[in-house]
Amino acid sequence: MKFFALFIQRPVATTLLTLAITLSGIIGFSLLPVSPLPQVDYPVIMVSASMPGADPETMASSVATPLERALGRIAGVNEMTSTSSLGSTRIILQFDLNRDINGAARDVQAALNAAQSLLPSGMPSRPTYRKMNPSDAPIMIMTLTSDTFSQGQLYDYASTKLAQKIAQTEGVSDVTVGGSSLPAVRVELNPSALFNQGVSLDAVRQAISAANVRRPQGSVDAAETHWQVQANDEIKTAEGYRPLIVHYNNGSPVRLQDVANVIDSVQDVRNAGMSAGQPAVLLVISREPGANIIATVDRIRAELPALRASIPASIQLNIAQDRSPTIRASLDEVERSLVIAVALVILVVFIFLRSGRATLIPAVAVPVSLIGTFAAMYLCGFSLNNLSLMALTIATGFVVDDAIVVLENISRHLEAGVKPMVAALRGVREVGFTVLSMSISLVAVFIPLLLMAGLPGRLFREFAVTLSVAIGISLVISLTLTPMMCAWLLRSHPKGQQQRIRGFGKVLLAIQQGYGRSLNWALGHTRWVMVVLLSTIALNVWLYISIPKTFFPEQDTGRMMGFIQADQSISFQSMQQKLKDFMQIVGADPAVDSVTGFTGGSRTNSGSMFISLKPLSERQETAQQVITRLRGKLAKEPGANLFLSSVQDIRVGGRHSNAAYQFTLLADDLAALREWEPKVRAALAKLPQLADVNSDQQDKGAEMALTYDRETMARLGIDVSEANALLNNAFGQRQISTIYQPLNQYKVVMEVAPEYTQDVSSLDKMFVINSNGQSIPLSYFAKWQPANAPLAVNHQGLSAASTISFNLPDGGSLSEATAAVERAMTELGVPSTVRGAFAGTAQVFQETLKSQLWLIMAAIATVYIVLGILYESYVHPLTILSTLPSAGVGALLALELFDAPFSLIALIGIMLLIGIVKKNAIMMVDFALDAQRNGNISAREAIFQASLLRFRPIIMTTLAALFGALPLVLSSGDGAELRQPLGITIVGGLVVSQLLTLYTTPVIYLYFDRLRNRFSKQPLMKLE
């Protein structure tokens, strides 16, 4: 009593406390970063190694395997996957979520150092690593185009000037340049001219390397002057290399220009980028973990004038994709929902209490509780994102509950003629324990969620903490500010202006009287009520089993990714044309705003596209509907497939795939894997629950297989290393020298001229000069024939692996898809030597699916324990928890009605319902117990009176929670697919539970009271 009086009788102190909470919240709000979802930093490290010209199998056996053995010993590695393709190996290490990324990076560096001695000596550089976050998509993509500058020059400007400046922008972590490669001097050899002059390819390489060196020449100290010695030991342009003497033939010099075409070009001619139908260089910008996306994008945009001024005017620098507009729009929609929810909740209070002054009290309490939460969010390192703002929207219905319970009880005393100060003290004392029980038991629901491991736990931690803090602040406000305002603002016997809306009071009274009659019947027919309750429990089980399930709602971020997979033997020139054709088809769709793409590099038959859709206000279709529409048009393109998927803010796993979900086949025997992968892929492609089924197993690439005649080689004085060097020099785009410039370093690249690299018959023109100076054609000691070879070799752990990727058809669910895949594997009879397992998002979904029921049970158990402690009873918590089955039925039926799958968002809605619907029972049980202890009446009479007495606050709090969630159900625009499942679950659960628990709770109370009387004759204890 004294505690409450302290705040009621000291209005200035209470007001200043409220202002302090509000001001701290406003400051916290201004400092909070902005992002689409809570930051989940998966500790992922990518190791890269290169050996230009090496085939995938060589890269896998000589580079990937030694590295995997060393890296596999690192503690905390959850998954290790590798892809070896032409000249490169990429290894992805995914660590435990709790592993420190910096410590993991040190371990990776140590492992790379240990493996260095096991790697081939021909590697141009040591393996490197970088940290990465697979779930963090680029925040911006820029393009450089020009009618006058070459692609190499554009790439040079992009990497040397623009990327450096952009990377220095606050919030930017990495800028990747693609679509071409750095400028280089290319030496395109003519095999016929070399043969005629008697010059070997390796002699040309050695001559170029020896002619371009950078070594210190020292200095000279004269008597009065210090002289630096500088020689023209470097050649920096193609023009400088052309007259270089590479050989003497009968005393006459053979110059490089006599046997080769020397041009200024690029390091890798098999790289191409496109934007808006013309060649382009791409700048892909990523943010730092936890950085404010909107602020970072704004900073980059502010730098655009300076960036454009730093490059020639004939180069166009444009933004092809910007992630911030959809984030801004989505957060604006959530904030709008929050404001609407607050307004609706306050309207509920006004309708029921019919007093402007009384309505003012929750109108102050609700914003203060919500605003104060921002301070705690900032201190916890959270961000303003869809989930944290959804938590505040839902919290609107929760935080007003405490104020409503206190306000309604005080108003009841005022209506009875009690003076305001006395009514405030008496009213808050009567319901103080009730409010405390409601708040603590509601927060207890989130304890299992806070302890949940893995991605879901990290993802919803902000949601749970934000909601819990809002409830905690609301508890403080409802027990301090609310009674103080009641004492100083409200009056006994309110009259006057409320007469005009008194009609609603009559309606409410009539409803209450009707409820009293129906409750009286229910208490007289308890068996029928119990049948209904047991039926809801059974219906819960059936609905949960039958409802389609998915991991996370399919988002429409306004961005799509396209992955091209062409015939494995396709040439680079044909691949460029495929990219252009696909970009034209996609760009012609009315919902598409821009398309940017690139192809080349180590994957010769693949390409990628970044697609931006028009804002939702300018298109009628969702991203998934656009994909479905384009799928039919894209299927008509021969020789290649384009797989489209909507970019999601949540992505799990570091492996590259052409679709959203992955199923990986593992085998110790590569032959068994190659035998069964096509069978499994064909079976999965027939499943209607899957779409865009494809595989990363590409073992049908065209290869010219050479067989050396070692006896002939020994007789001719040629060893295998010389023959291999010949092929590498001719076809490997071999980097043979480095050109040092003030801002960058460039390469001298040697291979045969393009007309020879595009025709396998050029092998007939290759030759080696043996130790006797004789020119020996390759055909003298080698035979070759066409064969198939892998374009990539994939490992998971130390096993050969092949990943089958798939998307979901429009309206499909992940649970149906995974179940169909498992059935197909069983029906195929795949041997035990070939193992299948879901990977990435599909794997996390299956793990989450197994833990969902345990999570719900843990939440119920936690609430039971908390209520048992609060009520000093084993039985009364069960009475309160009997409200849950009806809420579950309502939530699941609502999801079925709206054709929404059961996702993690819906699971959170169920968790919230556990906390919400028990409030009704708490209010009933509290007053019934108090009446039994102090009024000396029967349990039936006590629960009947409590139900009628608390009918108005029960209806008010339920409607407040319902209206708080209603804006989420009715939301549209960006991010609605995240908000709607939560709102649907809560509204459906509230409606059904409100109808049933008004009857089931009193009946359960009676049953347990009879049970208590049967086993114990002691009267109820009075709890102080």
Curated annotation (Swiss-Prot):
Compartments where located: Cell inner membrane
Pfam families: ACR_tran
UniProt-recorded Gene Ontology molecular function terms: xenobiotic transmembrane transporter activity
A GO-annotated cellular component: plasma membrane
Keyword hit for Transport: yes
Membrane topology: Multi-pass membrane protein
TM ranges: 12-32, 333-353, 360-380, 387-407, 435-455, 469-489, 528-548, 853-873, 875-895, 897-917, 953-973, 984-1004
Keywords: Cell inner membrane, Cell membrane, Membrane, Transmembrane, Transmembrane helix, Transport
Family annotation (SUPFAM superfamilies): Multidrug efflux transporter AcrB pore domain, PN1, PN2, PC1 and PC2 subdomains, Multidrug efflux transporter AcrB TolC docking domain, DN and DC subdomains, Multidrug efflux transporter AcrB transmembrane domain
UniProt entry tagged with the keyword Nucleotide-binding: no
InterPro entries (UniProt xref): AcrB_DN_DC_subdom, Acrflvin-R, Multidrug-R_MdtC
Domain of life, per lineage: Bacteria
Family from the record: Belongs to the resistance-nodulation-cell division (RND) (TC 2.A.6) family. MdtC subfamily.
Classification via NCBIfam families: PRK10614.1, RND_permease_2
Subunit structure of this chain's protein: Part of a tripartite efflux system composed of MdtA, MdtB and MdtC. MdtC forms a heteromultimer with MdtB.
Protein name (database record): Multidrug resistance protein MdtC
Organism the protein comes from: Yersinia pseudotuberculosis serotype O:1b (strain IP 31758)
Lineage: Bacteria, Pseudomonadati, Pseudomonadota, Gammaproteobacteria, Enterobacterales
Gene that specifies this protein: mdtC
